[in-house]
Amino acid sequence: KVFGRCELAAAMKRHGLDNYRGYSLGNWVCAAKFESNFNSQATNRNTDGSTDYGVLQINSRWWCNDGRTPGSRNLCNIPCSALQSSDITATANCAKKIVSDGNGMNAWVAWRKHCKGTDVRVWIKGCRL
């Protein structure tokens, strides 16, 4: 599913990401824009053999199990396919675990490159939330 910007913002808010660990909703929407272009089906293979999945491009080496990543830790205890659903419950719950891991949203390269230090309110502008 390719989410609309405000549609994804609303879903993220519903799942408790707004101000989770101090990160406003705009940060999450911005990260999703640059990680996946709001596409829940997005996958990207990494040079280490792991794959990133879903709107927030969550990695199979650490966070989910795709059955093909050597030494996968699966710290969110989910199949990676759950991160590709149109229902973002698994993505939101796993993202909360990731952002609590010590580096905050710096865990997302796209967030560091495109969102960090910017006015992320633009990402929820005009949305009825």
Curated annotation (Swiss-Prot):
Further information = Lysozyme C is capable of both hydrolysis and transglycosylation; it also shows a slight esterase activity. It acts rapidly on both peptide-substituted and unsubstituted peptidoglycan, and slowly on chitin oligosaccharides.
The segment(s) forming the C-type lysozyme domain are: 1-129
Q: Which InterPro entries match?
A: Glyco_hydro_22 (IPR001916), Glyco_hydro_22_CS (IPR019799), Glyco_hydro_22_lys (IPR000974), Lysozyme-like_dom_sf (IPR023346)
The similarity annotation says: Belongs to the glycosyl hydrolase 22 family.
Q: Is Transcription regulation one of the keywords UniProt gives this record? A: no
On whether Kinase is a keyword of this UniProt record, the answer is no
Record-level GO BP terms: defense response to Gram-negative bacterium; defense response to Gram-positive bacterium; killing of cells of another organism
Which taxonomic lineage does the organism of this UniProt entry have? Answer: Eukaryota, Metazoa, Chordata, Craniata, Vertebrata
Designated gene of the protein: LYZ
- Disulfide bond annotation, renumbered to this chain: 6-127, 30-115, 64-80, 76-94
Q: What is this protein called in UniProt?
A: Lysozyme C
Q: Tell me, how does this one assemble?
A: Monomer.
